[in-house]
């Protein structure tokens, strides 16, 4: 218990020293704002260069194993044409979470629209059960992007943050303390 009190008192003392001078406090706040704006600019550049609304996604389920595992981070690109066998990320109307699956087959309708059927590599049946009740095919507007690369397991932190709120609050608390103490 004494250790916690010592750490708390040390933190309060450091915060008082940091914000005693108004210029230093303002400098810390401006540095944080610049950091956030830089991250936003990088994200927007990725959106422009890849043509995808979400150029980076995390695999949330095991439906694509052994190719992609839960927590893998995928880099996406919006190609002009999709082929059977491509791994795509798509989003169905009314669902918030995008799905990462492979294109099983595709065909062109009479009005020259592409229709796609998807399936997870680890699933026994195609994805028609996931689509809207009277929808049998995906269309191009459902596809968010084509997987062009991945980084294994780096997205597991995202999954933990969403599944365990304690992890989210711990990370946010640590970041706030580091920002306020002047660690940039």
Swiss-Prot record:
Its EC number is 3.4.21.89. Keywords: Endoplasmic reticulum, Hydrolase, Membrane, Phosphoprotein, Protease, Signal-anchor, Transmembrane, Transmembrane helix. Disulfide bonds: none annotated. It catalyses: Cleavage of hydrophobic, N-terminal signal or leader sequences from secreted and periplasmic proteins. Phosphorylation increases catalytic activity. Ca(2+) slightly increases catalytic activity in vitro. One of its GO terms (cellular component) is endoplasmic reticulum. This is Signal peptidase complex catalytic subunit SEC11. The gene is SEC11.
